[in-house]
């Protein structure tokens, strides 16, 4: 029997990332993957308003429609890149559309997907508080904010009696460790749990790409921002070193990448940290969950 690392060792929980749902993953496969994920004892799903023109949320709404809402945790994100700002009208408009797509009256976590330099953060947080009081979300999350911004946000929320963020979703893997320097100490101090996205560096750590010239159809062709983030010579050089070490120790690069996150990174089950697991098909999902 495969050892389920996420449940039986450090207990770093997996969260099913749905960025591929509605693009590389059709509705039938979305349902299968969601059901399989839950059958393995996991119950947390992560989506966003911007994922695939709303189809990720629509598919999740259909996949979860017959399941008791108390049996799963559902997160979505509002994004300033849609309207150019995160004020009350923009957040409300996006969230109402998301709730309709997701076929629910409330999400467990509402993330601010990216910082909005055009709207004072006080205004954004006041808007979140008003929406929270209406019962449309249970927890406030942050994603892609700096350590300094997190400190400021927590201070504003504390001083005004507004719901403070309880979860932070950030880029983290064996190749990208910037968050360890400033962000992690801040979120530990403020009692915020951390969810790591891109655990396989968008696929670079899957072993699928051998060089900077080896791009094939997938995330790097479908999402240009991923190519900008990872398609660099230094990443490929690092992967070659890791692959050599993995080969010498009879372990796959994917397994080593997840084992590093679970056993040797800053993630810690006592803080209820998690790893966003994104997959393009059910076989990849099972593989990523069963090393």
Describe each model-derived feature in a short phrase.
Residues 2-72, 133:
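N-terminal binding-site loop/beta-alpha segment at the start of enzyme catalytic domains
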Residues 11-15, 43-44, 71-77, 106-111, ...:
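Structural preference for beta-strand elements that scaffold enzyme active sites
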Residues 14, 188-245, 270:
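Glycine-rich, positively charged active-site loop/lid region within alpha/beta enzyme cores that binds
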Residues 16, 45, 60, 74, ...:
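Conserved, mostly hydrophobic/aromatic
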Residues 19-21, 48-50, 77-81, 112-115, ...:
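Active-site beta-loop-alpha junctions enriched in small/polar residues
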Residues 25, 35, 83-178, 182, ...:
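Glycine/proline-rich, positively charged
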Residues 63-64, 93, 157-161, 184-186, ...:
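Short, hinge-like loop/turn segments at secondary-structure boundaries
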Residues 228-291:
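Conserved short secondary-structure transition element at the edge of the structured enzyme core
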């Amino acid at each position: 029997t495969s050892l389920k690392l996420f449940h039986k060792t450090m207990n770093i929980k997996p969260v099913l990332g749905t960025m591929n749902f509605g693009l590389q993953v059709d509705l039938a496969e979305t349902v299968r993957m969601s059901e399989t994920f839950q059958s393995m004892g996991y119950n947390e799903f992560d989506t966003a308003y911007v994922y695939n023109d709303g189809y990720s949320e629509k598919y999740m709404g259909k996949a979860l429609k017959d399941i008791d809402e108390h049996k799963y945790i559902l997160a979505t994100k509002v994004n300033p890149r849609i309207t150019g700002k995160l004020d009350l009208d923009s957040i409300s408009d996006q969230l109402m559309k998301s709730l309709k797509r997701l076929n629910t009256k409330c999400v467990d976590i509402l993330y601010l997907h990216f910082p909005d330099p055009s709207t004072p953060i006080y205004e954004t947080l006041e808007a979140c508080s008003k929406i929270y009081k209406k019962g449309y979300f249970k927890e406030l999350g942050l994603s892609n904010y700096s350590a300094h911004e997190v400190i400021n946000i927590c201070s504003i929320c504390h001083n005004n009696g507004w719901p403070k963020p309880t979860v932070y979703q950030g880029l983290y893997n064996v190749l990208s460790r910037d968050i360890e320097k400033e962000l992690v100490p801040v979120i530990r101090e403020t009692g915020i749990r951390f969810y790591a996205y891109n655990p396989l560096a968008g696929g670079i750590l899957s072993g699928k790409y051998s060089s900077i010239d080896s791009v094939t159809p997938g995330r790097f062709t479908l999402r240009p921002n991923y190519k900008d983030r990872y398609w660099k010579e230094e990443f490929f050089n690092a992967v070659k070193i890791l692959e050599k070490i993995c080969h010498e120790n009879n372990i796959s690069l994917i397994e080593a990448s997840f084992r590093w996150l679970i056993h040797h990174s800053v993630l810690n089950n006592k803080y209820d940290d998690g790893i966003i697991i994104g997959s393009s098909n059910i076989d990849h999902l099972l593989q990523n969950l069963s090393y």
